[in-house]
Every structure is written in structure tokens, then in C-alpha cells.
Amino acid sequence: MGLGLTSAALNSCSDLLSESAAMQLKGEIPAEGLPFRISLAQWSLHKSFWTGKLDNLDFAQYTKEQFGIDAVEYVNQFFSDKATDTVYLSKMNQRANDHGVSNQLIMIDAEGNLASLDEKSRLQAVENHYKWIDAAKFLNCHTIRVNAAGKGERNAVASAAVDSLGRLSEYGAKEGINVVVENHGGYSSDASWLAGVMKQVNNPYCGTLPDFGNFTMSLFPYKKYDPLQGLKELMPYAKGVSAKAHDFNSAGEDKSIDFPAMMQIVKDFGYQGHVGIEYEGYKLSENAGIKATKELLIRSGQGLS
């Protein structure tokens, strides 16, 4: 998920892939032969969900019919009060099964800071996440994505994150569910920090969800971790990959993210799981942006050495 950090609105319109061009893409490039599989992150359609244009129960069907994608990544914000509602979760399963779509993971937000230096609130945050591990298991997902958010001295925040992730990973291991951290702002966007946390947790059910676009550590002052280096440091622990895209030039390449280079790193680490499309641009509609990102991801995959 995004941090709202793109400056795409300031870019010239002259080299953008037009809305109409993206919407009129014909004959999608077949994904066969790629060293990875493609999924769709629900956040790519967050505007449609927030406005009520789309309903969470329709996500799997919409993904298959509109984009030809058969794997989905949910965001708990769109069914935040349903974690323990097995009737509702059963409907989600049924909708996915009816359309041949596999549920991959749930991205968890707004359940507290897992790296808070306030122990009471941090342990409550850990407790708040347990129900989502249960929900993920019910939905036949393999993973939940959490945020290692916290403020304070670097090492102290890391220690807090290690303790919380250790607790969650132990619970996840019992249920067969991975707990992964996305580089998602603050210390977590510092790949060396997050890799260090992973080393300390040292649990096979704890890992990372590297996001191509979330390496900005702070805005004031602006500080960004090198994305290519960051991806290399996070891939050893990756249990998923988030292919963030913003805006595109006339050749259909992302203007701020080097997709071919990023995907080469993903391949070089032997990753063969799902790569989730997460379109977060403003110049194209959500549907057009998702389609453009899918085409870019496939082209990048087909060009790997």
C-alpha cells in the first residue's frame, strides 16, 4: 500500500500513456512461461471501494473478469469488522472459488503499532492481529501483511518489532500462516533495518513483502533508501512481492520505478511466487492503471535473463 509520496502530478503530460490507450489494450500478453505468477492487490481499487462503486465480496470476480488475474490480495480496511464473521468469510471464499480465484494474503492496517515503545499498547496491537491470522486461515490465504510501525530510537524500535513479530509468527506457525512486513514508511523503509529485524526474529513463518515503491523513509527531511539495494536486502526473506506502479511514459514504462531491474533482482533470488500488482497512480483510472501495470510486469518478466 502506498504512502502518498508520488510527485507524478507535477510531471509533464506529454509522455504519459493515455487513458484511452491503456483502456484499449487488446489481446493481453499471455503470462505463461514467466518465472512468477501475478496477483492483484485490492488497494489498486481503493477509490472504487471507498466510494461504494465496488463491494469487497465482488473483488475476486471483478479481478478475474476485468483483468484476467486469478489471485487476489485483500486489504482488511474493506472488511474491517468481519475478521471473526465466518458467515461473511465463507461468502468471500465462495465468490473466489466460483470464479477460480485463489486468496493469497490479507494486508492488515489500523490494528495498532507493532513496534511501539509503549509496551501496553504494543501488546494490545499484537493481540489485535491474532484474529486476522485466523481469518487468513479461514480464507485459505498463506500470509498476513503487517506494519512494523513505531517511533523512537532506531534500535529500541527494532527490539520492539522483534518481540511483536516473534509472538505473531509463533501464533502464525501454529495456523500455517506467514506474517510478513512491508517496507511501508519510517524505519521499515530502511531495508537494512528491516532485514536486521528479520534476522533477529529468525522464524520461518516471518518474512517480508518488498514493495517496489515504498523506500521513502521520511519526507522532512526527504530521505530515501536506494530501491534496488533495498530490494536485494529484503528478498532473502520475501514471501510475496508488491509491484507498485504510479504513472507511465509513452512506452508504457513506469516513470519512477525501474521494473526490468527490479524484476531481475526478484528472479535472481529464485523467487517464483506471486507478484502483486499495486497501481497507485493518479493520471489513469484504476482499471487502466492496473492493466498498464500488468502489461509492464509481463514485459519485464519476459525480458529477464
Predicted regions and their residues:
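C-terminal segment of N-terminal export signals and the immediately downstream linker at the start
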Residues: 12-43
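Hydrophobic faces of well-ordered beta-strands that scaffold small-molecule active sites
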Residues: 36-42, 70-74, 103-108, 144-146, ...
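Conserved, mostly hydrophobic/aromatic
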Residues: 40, 63, 96, 125, ...
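Glycine-rich, proline-tolerant flexible connector loops at the mouths of alpha/beta enzymes
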Residues: 71-94, 148-153
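Acidic/histidine-rich catalytic cores of soluble enzymes
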Residues: 33, 71-72, 166-264
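Charged helix-capping and loop-helix junction motifs
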Residues: 54-58, 86-91, 122, 126-130, ...
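Active-site acidic/histidine proton-transfer and metal-coordination neighborhood
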Residues: 4-9, 22-30, 61, 95-210, ...
